[in-house]
Regions:
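Short, solvent-exposed loop/turn segments at the edges of secondary structure
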Residues: 7, 12-14, 24-27, 82, ...
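M16/MPP (pitrilysin/insulinase) zinc-metallopeptidase core fold and M16-derived inactive scaffolds
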Residues: 1-33, 99-103
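Acidic/histidine-enriched alpha-helical segments
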Residues: 13, 54-72, 139, 158-171
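Buried hydrophobic packing residues in well-ordered domains
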Residues: 1, 12, 30, 46, ...
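M16/insulysin-pitrilysin zinc metalloprotease superfamily fold
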Residues: 2, 33-64
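Non-catalytic accessory/assembly modules
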Residues: 58-65, 78-86, 138, 145
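An aromatic/glycine/proline-enriched structural segment found at the starts
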Residues: 94, 98, 131-172
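Histidine-acidic residue clusters that define the catalytic metal-binding segment
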Residues: 89-130, 158-166
Length: 172
């Protein structure tokens, strides 16, 4: 939730929609599926998330537990689940892809601090570092209008150049 919207999921569900998110090494993808009549609701919710994500000890602990359970489900609780963790460090020696998005071990998640989470959010979550995709039976002019209305006033954040090291050629 955010400082303004505590019941994000409930609002989406009442509008006839659903939402979720996933991460990869290169992106975090938040998505909402709603009837077109409620399109503006999605813009309002996402701009509010970008403007005022709620950073509370409770929200951090809830998300920490969710991610720990995802880690266990994906890597520890299934046969050969840890193979992806093991292969990364074999395939990549310098590139950030050597590190799993979710952390290399449960302690990485458990020990994440509020300051680290805030720093990451404020470094990466801004309209100038986001891609908005709207699909369905909607008009382009409406999407442009809603984009400007809900995201236009959000302050750009400093762009960060990712200095990704060149991965040495693999010989084995």
């Amino acid at each position: 939730g955010s400082v303004n919207i505590f019941n994000y999921d409930e609002i989406v569900e009442k509008a006839g929609g659903q939402n979720n998110a996933f991460t990869s090494n290169d992106i975090t993808n938040y998505y909402i599926t709603l009837p077109k009549e409620n399109l503006e609701q999605a813009f309002r919710l996402e701009s509010d998330r970008m403007l005022g994500l709620a950073f509370t000890p409770k929200s951090l602990e809830v998300q920490r537990q969710v991610v720990v359970e995802e880690f266990k489900q994906n890597y520890l609780n299934q046969p050969y689940g840890d193979i992806h963790l093991l292969l990364r460090s074999l395939a990549y020696k310098k590139h950030p892809y050597q590190w799993p998005t979710i952390g290399k071990e449960v302690s990485h998640i458990e020990n994440a601090t509020m300051d680290e989470v805030k720093s990451f959010f404020y470094k990466h979550y801004a309209p100038n570092n986001a891609i908005l995709v709207v699909a369905g039976d909607v008009e382009l002019d409406q999407v442009k209008h809603l984009s400007e209305k809900w995201f236009g006033s959000i302050v750009r954040r400093e762009s960060h150049i990712r200095n990704i090291p060149t991965e040495p050629q693999q010989t084995k």
